[in-house]
UniProtKB/Swiss-Prot annotation:
Substrate binds at residues 154-156, 200, 213-214, 236. This is D-erythrose-4-phosphate dehydrogenase. Keywords: Cytoplasm, NAD, Oxidoreductase, Pyridoxine biosynthesis. It comes from the Bacteria. The lineage of its organism: Bacteria, Pseudomonadati, Pseudomonadota, Gammaproteobacteria, Enterobacterales. The active site is at residue 155. The record marks 182 as: Activates thiol group during catalysis. GO terms for molecular function: erythrose-4-phosphate dehydrogenase activity; NAD binding; NADP binding. Belongs to the glyceraldehyde-3-phosphate dehydrogenase family. Epd subfamily. It catalyses: D-erythrose 4-phosphate + NAD(+) + H2O = 4-phospho-D-erythronate + NADH + 2 H(+). NAD(+) binds at residues 12-13, 81, 318. Pathway: Cofactor biosynthesis; pyridoxine 5'-phosphate biosynthesis; pyridoxine 5'-phosphate from D-erythrose 4-phosphate: step 1/5. One of its GO terms (biological process) is glucose metabolic process.
Length: 348
């Protein structure tokens, strides 16, 4: 069965989802039937074809009126501001990938379903009242047909959760801290300008800028046992893509750095293949651009202090890796089937 999807919001994640769909060879499994975006069709086509981070798209892209052509495929373009006006029922949409970054609570998800979609996948953590939050590779097997409104968590949550699980399963995590070293994003300023966050009034290309993060909450949403045992901070740096995460955890069992690396390398080659990668090459952030993994462990940076404090450095392409996980989760949601009785919903 080919899953019929619509994309709401054609920004960084929305466009990368389309690119990843074609580049990963999963077009036979997923069809994009419509994209809803307030920008005009010419701009949508241009930014899909040409991308500063990811280069030129290999497929032919063109537009005619309100249709986007990717190769031989025709995708309907919509410009609806109100979720209730979206024609998902008319288009036979199975799953909406809401990539706006604006919508993300149960009411928004129900609006997509009322418009005719069978399920909704948000491209950010969303509110606590959703049916499920999925970090693919860790908990997607808990999805059920009645989980209709789902979050794909965040790029940084997808990056760090697999590593936390591996370390906890092996050594028993007592507590931890996380520092996200994140590329600049489009909620920052090119030159100094007004913003409600005074640090983000400053030019993104000229400073390392501390920002708020909900990553600790994202960790405990997946692993409730770590409530009040993880803290996180984040800084934005003057690069346009790729993120590094500094993870420090205290563990119950004594361990050596070489043992930590052996564990993570084995997982990358085995149970977490395709989700986690491992390297000991002397690489820098740009070398991970366009990497489809959720997490790439840099074994050269692993440290252990006092046998119980582990520090690791984990890289991710915060756009491309996450876009690939959106596709993975979409297929997982479709694989468990569609149960349309809203009263049967049970929270994951």
């Amino acid at each position: 069965m080919t899953v019929r999807i619509a994309i709401n919001g054609f920004g960084r994640i929305g466009r990368n989802v389309v690119r990843a769909l074609y580049e990963s060879g999963r077009r036979a499994e997923i069809t994009v039937v419509a994209i809803n975006e307030l920008a005009d069709a010419a701009g949508m086509a241009h930014l899909l074809k040409y991308d500063t981070s990811h280069g030129r798209f290999a497929w032919e892209v063109r537009h005619e009126r309100e249709q986007l052509f990717v190769g031989d495929d025709v995708i309907r373009i919509l410009h609806e501001r109100t979720l209730a006006d979206l024609p998902w029922r008319e288009l036979g949409v199975d799953i909406v990938l809401d990539c706006t970054g604006v919508y993300g609570n149960r009411e928004h998800g129900e609006a997509h379903i009322a418009a005719g979609a069978k399920k909704v996948l948000f491209s950010h953590p969303g509110s606590n009242d959703l049916d499920a939050t999925v970090v693919f590779g860790v908990n997607q097997n808990q999805l059920r047909a009645e989980h209709r409104i789902v979050s794909n968590a965040s790029c940084t949550t997808n990056c760090i959760i697999p590593v936390i699980k591996l370390l906890d399963d092996a050594y028993g995590i007592e507590s931890g801290t996380v520092t996200t070293i994140h590329s600049a994003m489009n909620d920052q300023q090119v030159i100094d300008a007004y913003h409600s966050d005074l640090r983000r009034t400053r030019a993104a290309s000229q400073s390392i800028i501390p920002v708020d993060t909900k990553l600790a909450a994202g960790i405990t949403r997946i692993f409730p046992q770590f409530n009040d045992r993880f803290e996180a901070i984040a800084v934005r740096v003057p690069t346009i893509n790729v993120t590094a995460i500094d993870l420090s955890v205290t563990v119950k069992k004594p361990v050596k750095a070489s043992e930590v690396n052996q564990l993570l390398q084995k997982a990358a080659q085995g149970a977490f293949h395709g989700i986690v990668d491992y390297t000991e090459s002397p690489l820098v952030s740009i070398d991970f651009n366009h990497d489809p993994h959720s997490a790439i462990v840099d074994g050269t940076q692993t440290r252990v202090s006092g046998a119980h404090l582990i520090k690791t450095l984990v890289w991710c392409d915060n756009e491309w890796g996450f876009a690939n996980r959106m596709l993975d989760t979409t297929l997982a949601m479709a694989a468990v089937g569609f149960r349309l009785d809203a009263s049967a919903s049970t929270k994951l």
